[in-house]
């Protein structure tokens, strides 16, 4: 009996994860072979030139909603007094957000007094009415923080790896514009290209002026060494203690030293089989200097920015596979949006900080929030590798489809357990999974995807697959809860629609819906039919009316004509419409002629072809969705 139980348990577990001889574990439908970057793509076509990427960066920085900073053009003098006041107000707002559900490195919830101490430290005691900004360079992997304090802010005392202080990771040699300092002098208020927050002062070197600052990080392509691996460490050295074991994370860009004599010792070593780079150093007085360091040619680094190809995107993304997830850049790692930023930084592309801000970037994108399921499937089948997919609070890189499954790679905090989707499972790693994984609301990731964005195509390029003519109408009707999919969330666009369904849609469009007392066994459409009958929306000439019968195009025209008059809309628009221009005009029933004139004249229904209206044909769900959207547009105009 015990043996049977053990076997049953093993069989149960095998449905939850895959385990291979290597000892690595995978989520369902993920195999060991899929962990290789080359499994997904080997395409080496250059997707964008360096010049195109530079132009795109300018557009991203200037686009409304991306919250990016043009660092070179920030004000050089600010009002420090006013800034102190603004910082205090914003910090009070932040404290109000966190108060009541967070902890300060203890089992006791943080109090208002705890936050007041942090807020007090935001005030620069040396603030001036006219205050020059400072120009800093990060000398070690660090972060921007919510408050100027090392104290961690947790939402769970048992989960000290997730610290809400972290806003974004800052790479070695990354520039920041400094606008203020904390009361204790241990933090600077700073901006990097995508965020603002408090940076530890001991992680920043202050340049002598703006010109020196720009020269440190504005590196020409041929003079740059780019770290494309998740983490690269400089070698240990007693002689070179300033750079010994220095961590360089994905997307770090350093300047290559020129005119190097390989016999010249760098930290007690010759330069053979190494790159020689300049590394920023913070002097004892906090000022900037630089020193040479060696990086092995076998490290995951690249001379110049990498060429933007699908093969290289995959290579970079997979260098972080299995590594730690770090909220806001914590744990010297990154979260989902930070991970995507780091990947594309290796190609000199600057993405916005978070999922919301990235959605405003001027790139090829498609809003899938209200896309019907079958259309979504068709759309996914044509998605290019490297597309960034979004739903509320998460983003991921699309890899491809296999055996009807869609695969993504992302830095993941939690998912619902595949074998028990009511239980939340902490992941905290960069992983591969299918879009069959579920969220806490019971929907799959596939169901929840709201946006697809291709970073390597401009906004005017046809980078994403085209979607069907009825997408706008379907999206409108789903969004406004006029229509819905079936129990499996399929929209069924080609299915013919019935009288009952159309009447229910019109009923759904009413802002104030009359309630009727109905029998327990009344059909689902009973209220809508009764409402339509009371308001004389069913034409008396439709003697064959049956709620479950399919509605013809001329019946639909008559229904919308009567509904427009019921709502008080102007129906005179169709009085001059010459429907005799259609070859099958005499097939239109006499009672429906005014309605067909109105609905065709208003552009709500169009001919099946240039010369026919097919009045006796049935109407599909896709057609009615578009008709409703056009009808609402007519009403608005």
What are these regions (language model features)?
Residues 460-471, 479-554, 562-592, 606-618, ...:
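Feature responds to low-complexity, polar/acidic, surface-exposed segments characteristic
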Residues 173, 222, 249-254, 385-386:
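Loop/turn positions that initiate beta-strands
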Residues 169, 351-419:
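...with weaker cross-activation on analogous glycine-rich loops/strands in unrelated enzymes
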Residues 22-145, 151-156, 161, 171, ...:
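Boundary regions of SH3-family modules and the immediately adjacent low-complexity/disordered segments
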Residues 231, 236-293, 323-334, 390-438:
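Glycine-rich catalytic cores of cysteine/serine-nucleophile enzymes that process amide/ester linkages
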Residues 317, 327-358, 499, 503, ...:
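Active-site nucleophilic cysteine motif
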Residues 8-18:
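Bacterial N-terminal signal peptides
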Residues 22-38, 194, 202-226, 230-234, ...:
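Aromatic- and glycine-rich peptidoglycan recognition patches
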């Amino acid at each position: 009996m015990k043996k049977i139980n053990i076997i049953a348990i093993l069989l149960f577990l095998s449905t939850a994860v895959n385990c291979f001889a290597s000892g690595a574990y995978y989520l369902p439908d993920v195999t060991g072979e899929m962990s290789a970057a080359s499994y997904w793509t080997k395409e080496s076509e250059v997707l964008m030139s360096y010049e195109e990427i530079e132009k795109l960066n300018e557009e991203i920085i200037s686009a409304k909603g991306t919250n990016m900073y043009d660092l070179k053009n920030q004000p050089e003098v600010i009002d420090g007094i006013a800034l102190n006041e603004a910082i205090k107000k914003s910090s009070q707002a932040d404290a109000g957000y966190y108060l009541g559900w967070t902890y300060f490195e203890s089992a006791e919830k943080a109090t208002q007094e705890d936050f007041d101490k942090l807020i007090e430290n935001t005030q620069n005691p040396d603030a001036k009415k006219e205050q020059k900004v400072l120009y800093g360079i990060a000398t070690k992997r660090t972060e921007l923080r919510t408050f100027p304090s090392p104290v961690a802010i947790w939402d769970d005392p048992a989960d000290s790896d997730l610290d809400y202080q972290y806003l974004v990771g800052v790479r070695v040699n990354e520039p920041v514009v400094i606008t203020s300092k904390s009361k204790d002098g241990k933090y600077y208020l700073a901006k990097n290209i995508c965020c603002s927050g408090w940076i530890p002062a001991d992680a920043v070197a202050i340049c002598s002026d703006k010109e020196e600052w720009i020269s440190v990080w504005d590196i020409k392509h041929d003079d740059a060494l780019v770290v494309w691996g998740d983490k690269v460490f400089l070698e240990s050295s007693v002689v070179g203690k300033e750079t010994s074991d220095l961590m360089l994370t994905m997307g770090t860009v350093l300047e290559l030293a020129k005119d190097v004599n390989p016999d010249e010792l760098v930290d007690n070593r010759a330069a053979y089989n190494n790159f020689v780079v300049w590394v920023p150093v913070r002097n004892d007085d906090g000022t900037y200097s630089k020193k040479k360091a060696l990086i092995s040619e076998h490290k995951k680094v690249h001379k110049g920015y990498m060429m933007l190809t699908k093969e290289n995107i995959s290579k970079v993304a997979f260098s972080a596979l299995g590594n730690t997830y770090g909220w806001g850049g914590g744990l010297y790692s990154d979260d989902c949006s930070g991970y995507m930023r780091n990947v594309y930084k290796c190609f000199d592309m600057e993405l916005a900080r978070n999922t919301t801000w990235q959605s405003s970037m001027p790139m090829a994108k498609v809003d899938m929030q209200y896309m019907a399921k079958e259309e979504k499937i068709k759309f996914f089948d044509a998605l290019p590798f490297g597309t960034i997919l979004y739903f509320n609070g998460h983003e991921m890189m699309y890899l491809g489809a296999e055996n009807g499954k869609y695969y993504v790679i992302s830095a993941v905090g939690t998912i619902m357990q595949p074998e028990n989707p009511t239980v939340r499972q902490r992941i905290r790693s960069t992983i591969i999974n299918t879009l069959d994984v579920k969220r806490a609301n019971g929907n799959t990731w596939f169901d929840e995807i709201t946006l697809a964005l291709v970073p390597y195509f401009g906004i005017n390029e046809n980078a994403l697959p085209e979607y069907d003519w009825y997408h706008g109408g379907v999206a409108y009707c789903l969004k406004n809860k006029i229509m819905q999919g079936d129990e499996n969330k399929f929209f069924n666009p080609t299915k013919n629609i019935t009288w009952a369904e159309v009447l229910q849609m019109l009923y759904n469009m009413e802002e104030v819906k009359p309630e009727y007392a109905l029998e327990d066994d009344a059909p689902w459409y009973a209220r809508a039919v009764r409402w339509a009958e009371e308001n004389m929306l069913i034409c008396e000439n439709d003697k064959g009316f049956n709620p479950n019968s399919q509605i013809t195009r001329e019946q639909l025209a008559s229904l919308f004509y009567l509904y427009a008059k019921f709502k008080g809309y102007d129906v005179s628009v169709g009085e001059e419409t010459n429907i005799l221009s259609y070859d099958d005009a005499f097939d239109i029933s006499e009672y429906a002629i005014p309605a067909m004139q109105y609905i065709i004249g208003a552009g709500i229904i169009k001919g099946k072809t240039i010369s026919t209206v097919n009045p006796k044909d049935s109407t599909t769900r896709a057609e009615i969705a578009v008709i409703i959207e056009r009808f609402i547009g007519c009403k608005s105009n």
